[in-house]
Amino acid sequence: MSHSTPVYSIMYRRLEKLVELIWLPGTQSMTDDDFKDTLTVFAECGLQHRARRLIIDMREFKHRPGPEVQVFRDEVIMPKYVQAGVEKLAWIWPGESGDWITKSAGGTYYNRYFDTADQALSWLATTQ
């Protein structure tokens, strides 16, 4: 990535076993390769810390990934979440709603959309 404007921030919260990805406004100029690189860094962080919970804040996300990115996410990224031991993934994405279970070779994890970070963190703090 050769951006002068930051495109993301990743934080690890040890006590919560949580890794958080916050997309920043610089995503407007990112490429699909930049997007895939960021997802890889996020997934590797989850693996490194054996994260049980993930949160992705989409409020400032401006990039529109191409269709091949979904294949990459399904085949490369989601198995890393399962390998890390992820149980829940919260999406902060105002206007979206719903929840679902992601099934990948070796495991599953729960997903849910939220309007605010507080709502997402509250859900992540509960047990299944």
Predicted regions and their residues:
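Amphipathic, Lys/Arg-enriched alpha-helical "gate/interface" segment within cytosolic domains
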Residues: 1-128
